[in-house]
């Protein structure tokens, strides 16, 4: 398994196409993302990921961006396969405090989770600060988890296959909390027949106002 790190430079445009360089290629502006309207996610680019032919490989790898100058996570990119999936229970991640971590309870439940960009069930990463962002329960469970499960179930059913998987946190300006993430996936051996998606998942919590610049929150 190859595990790598690459530098990340953030601007107003937050989609990185070439994960082997520091160049950023914009497909949409964060300001063009429509406001949350009741659905946990929207599709991007007709649900087709932005991978190119050079990305398709059957070699396993994991790549995580360095934290930027504000301490924020960048693109996380992997070729998910049985080889890199965890073989033991998830470890403790409570020592990691991602940017914007201003935890509060509402109705007896914590607002924020430490959200894996590449889910633990896919790559076995525990307290990797390059892979954890501040996200709401709704974002984590209702938004990201169904897509993670789709990839995990495909690999479980096809243990010799691979899924290219990239998660890009989308920050507006210098905000410390991401507005959401772009999730892209493509099953390599069957050329996307069983897994192929490109979605933006909203980092919101119904009934709660979030100040994305700081992580502070309040009831609506």
Where are these regions (language model features)?
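Hydrophobic membrane-insertion alpha-helices, especially the h-region
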Residues: 1-7
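Domain-level detector of nuclease and nuclease-like folds
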Residues: 51-220
